[in-house]
Amino acid sequence: MKPWLRKLNQWTKTIWPALIWSAFVFVLLIIPSSKLPNETLVPIPYFDKIVHLILFGGFAFFWDQYLSLQKGFFLKAYRYGFVILLIIVYGLLIEYLQVSVGRKFELMDLLADITGGIFMLKKIPGKIGRDRS
């Protein structure tokens, strides 16, 4: 394996990918409404909910990836439930903070966050595309 690839592989096993993705999600979802375009850029119904599904699917993937590699992590056996709890808490926090920047708390956004996370946890672990059941 090439040295740069080995370093990248080691880096992906750290907490940094999960933290960077979490920060990315936060920045995208906390943008003040005055900075958002009035017209949707993509004429797809519920496009904002699709964005939430994708962002929190990534959130679930990166946090599950990190937690699955932790030796001795006391919640390792329950990491899927723990990741879902993280999604709920983080989604609630973001929705609550959006009010302070002129946006609205939307329950449907929170449901899209949770759905995206659960879908990713169901589909990704092990081999891509293979159900856990």
Ranges and model annotations:
Residues I31-P32, G102, I128:
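Short helix-capping/hinge motifs at transmembrane helix termini and TM-loop junctions
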Residues I20-L29, R79-V99, I114:
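Small-polar-interrupted transmembrane alpha-helices in polytopic inner-membrane proteins
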Residues I54-Q70, G117-I128:
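Membrane-interfacial alpha-helical segments at the cytosolic side of multi-pass membrane proteins
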Residues M1-N9, F73-K76, D131-S133:
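Membrane-interfacial, low-structure loops and terminal tails that flank and connect transmembrane helices
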Residues K13, L75-G81, E106-L107:
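Membrane-helix interface segments
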Residues M1-Y66, V83:
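"…centered on the first transmembrane helix and the immediately adjacent amphipathic helix/loop
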Residues P37-E39, P45, G91-T115:
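Interfacial helix-loop-helix junctions of multi-pass membrane proteins
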Residues K35-E39, L69-Y78:
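Short helix-coil transition/hinge motifs at the ends and kinks of transmembrane helices
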